[in-house]
Amino acid sequence: MKNLLSILFLFSFAHLIFGQNQDRNTFSSNTLYVGKSITVPEAYNTNKENYYDEISPKIFSLYIEQVNFPKITAKITGRGNQFSIEGIIDNDKITCLFNGKSDNGLDGMYELKIENDSIKGYWLANNQNSSEPVKKNIVLGKRTFLYNPQNMISEEFTGEIIDFEHPKNFKEKNSSQVIKYRVGTDIIYKINASTDVLTSEILKNMRKLDLEIIKNSILARHGFSFKDKTFMLYFSAESWYIPNSINVDADLTDIEKSNIVLLNQYIATANDVYKEM
């Protein structure tokens, strides 16, 4: 009987020790995860002016900086903002509770759980218009960021390049108001401003939206997080895009710096082409 009790004690002790170690290694330091947050259907408010913006997936990254069990520190980057958060790893659920405090639209409470190479959970985002937070589901995958100047915008979507975030009212001949959206061209698939030396001859007749996309493609390759919704949503569709910085100036190559200067000159004077959808 004593031997049986001794065995049970040793088994329980070993399970406690090794079980804790396994949980401690679940979240690893210096690990990057990238994914999107999606507002859960029951939190939709169809009466809000920004309803479609609220429900559209938002890409962001979570970088686990340090794990000092049970404490964990991480950095969240998204929507053109970046901030550090601290949390506690819950041994039982293998979850981590983050309480971000900021005014950048990413604050609230995060409850996350490791599943293999993914992080899943939810985010109770602070709501400026209500005391009730907005619940968003989160799915993040483990990624490694590597700058690649050859990354190009995918031609998978062969339709028109449309900026739905900046509509403009036009008065027609019959005095009615028509909403139109600025459109780009397929030139954005052909110019790589990270590798090609741009000239005035190339840029002088281009549309403003095309110029902006070509310029921001440079920043996207370096992991820049866009605050402008047009480009945040546009580059979110690219598998290579990993937002992990809010300032990439120090990372730009000489070609990129020179091209950005020239692109900015033409963006300042270029015209947009608008179309009714």
Regions found by a protein language model. Name each.
Residues I188-S200, P243-I246:
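Acidic/histidine-rich, surface-exposed loop or edge segments in extracytoplasmic proteins
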Residues F226, L233-M277:
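Compact alpha-helical subdomains of small soluble proteins
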Residues P167-K190:
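Charged, compositionally biased N-terminal leader segments and the immediate start
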Residues M1-N25:
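Bacterial Sec-dependent N-terminal signal peptides
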Residues N21-Y63, K71-R79, F83-E172:
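Beta-sheet ligand-binding and adhesion/scaffold domains
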Residues K48-Y52, I114, Y189-N192, R207-K208, ...:
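Mature, Sec-exported extracytoplasmic domains of Gram-positive
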Residues I202-P243:
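Amphipathic alpha-helical packing elements
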